[in-house]
Curated annotation (Swiss-Prot):
This is Probable butyrate kinase. The lineage of its organism: Bacteria, Bacillati, Bacillota, Bacilli, Bacillales. It is found in: Cytoplasm. The keyword Membrane does not apply. Belongs to the acetokinase family. It is an enzyme of class 2 (transferase). Gene3D superfamilies: 3.30.420.40. Keywords: ATP-binding, Cytoplasm, Kinase, Nucleotide-binding, Transferase. Its main location: cytoplasm. Pfam families: Acetate_kinase. GO terms for biological process: acetate metabolic process.
Length: 367
């Protein structure tokens, strides 16, 4: 079997994780931590790409990695327009949307840009895989009770899809032939209904929908939320932080450290026990809803993400949902591996690369 050497890049706000893979085998994995003073020199996140590129190349050189031997470069997908899942070739339309922050400005936008900048000099392809904007929801799932306010698909697409493929292989099937419910449980929690390789419904784990998590509020009573918004006591940014960043366990018990909360539970703390069980309860409830989406025809329920290491949480969820289908636990997440595997499927011609296409923009005549 021929060896494809792939460089993968996963940019974060103050670090860049890189990996070099020979097919599925990791040759190098490293987290580059950037000096905050250096980061602050740049007004826009997107302006950091040259600095990060040079740092990546220096690290590769220091480890004796000959970049001329690379077959492809794959970056984490950023905040693009809604697209279906898969591996995409980085093209000009994608670069423009990443640089302009079409759906928002985030460090992940640098992934495709860095991949392209390094790959173009080597005349090899640059890819992204399953960004958070993956949207395969069915029309019926988009409807909310307010006209003009559609439900959005924003979830842990990269890890959910990667784990779904692993589980499919473990049980001897193709991902595209299965119905799965995948619950990714980390700083945010998303539960996706996977039908024949498409995530046809999923909670928006970023903007206040679904189970609460270590630092996100999830679904909350809307009437009370509106009253709080217009109480005159909070600015908009403060309210957004209550939803994302300072919600969930942070709001309820004062920490986003699930290990700390679990230790409190083991010591018999009644408040911590109730709150931790409530988080498991809400995850189980979301899984139950996803089972209805799939008409009760589910091949497996999969629990993944960092919180899947918690035996207390897993057992609480299992007790409530194991009547629906077998529960498989895949703790943690490996985004570098998932990116490498996405690129590898294309290099091996197991699937075709997808093209990022922007529909022609409407023009407005001005007198």
């Amino acid at each position: 079997m021929s060896v494809n050497r792939i460089l993968v890049i996963n940019p974060g706000s103050t670090s860049t994780k890189i990996g070099v893979f020979d097919n599925e085998r990791p040759v190098l994995e490293e987290t580059i931590r950037h000096d905050t003073g250096e980061i602050k020199k740049y007004k826009r996140i997107i302006d950091q790409y040259e600095f990060r590129k040079e740092t990546i190349l220096e690290i590769l050189h220091s480890h004796g990695i000959n970049i001329s031997k690379l077959s492809a470069v794959c970056g984490r997908g950023g905040l693009l327009r809604p697209i279906e899942g898969g591996t995409y070739t980085v093209n000009e339309a994608m670069l423009e949307d990443l640089k302009n922050g079409y759906s928002g400005h985030h460090a992940s936008n640098l992934g495709g840009i860095l991949a392209y900048e390094i790959a173009s000099g080597l005349n090899i392809p640059a890819f992204i895989v399953d960004p958070v904007v993956v949207d395969e929801m069915e029309p019926i799932a988009r409807i909310s009770g307010i006209a003009g306010m559609e439900r959005k698909s924003i979830f842990h697409a990269l890890n959910q899809k990667a784990v779904a493929r692993k589980v499919a292989a473990e049980i001897g099937h193709k991902y595209e032939d299965l119905n799965l419910i995948i619950a990714h449980m980390g700083g945010g929690i998303t539960v996706g209904a996977h039908k024949n390789g498409k995530v046809i419904d999923v909670n928006n784990g970023l903007n206040g929908e679904g189970p609460f998590s270590p630092e996100r509020a999830g679904t909350v009573p809307v009437g009370q939320l509106i009253e709080m918004c217009f109480s005159g006591n909070y600015y908009r940014d403060e309210m957004m932080k209550k939803i994302v960043g300072q919600g969930g366990l942070v709001s309820l018990i004062g920490t986003n450290d699930a290990i700390k909360v679990e230790n409190m539970v083991e010591k018999g703390d009644p408040e911590a026990t109730l709150i931790y069980k409530a988080m498991a309860y809400q995850v189980a409830k979301e899984i139950g809803g996803a089972s209805a989406v799939l008409h009760g025809k589910i091949d497996a329920i999969v629990l993944t993400g960092g919180l899947a290491y918690s035996k207390i949480l897993i057992n609480e969820i299992k007790e409530r949902v194991n009547w629906i289908a077998d529960v498989i636990v895949h703790p943690g997440e490996d985004e570098l591996q998932a990116l490498a595997e996405g690129a590898l499927r294309v290099l091996r011609e197991e699937e075709a690369p997808k093209e990022y296409v922007v529909r022609e923009k409407e023009t407005v005549a001005r007198g």
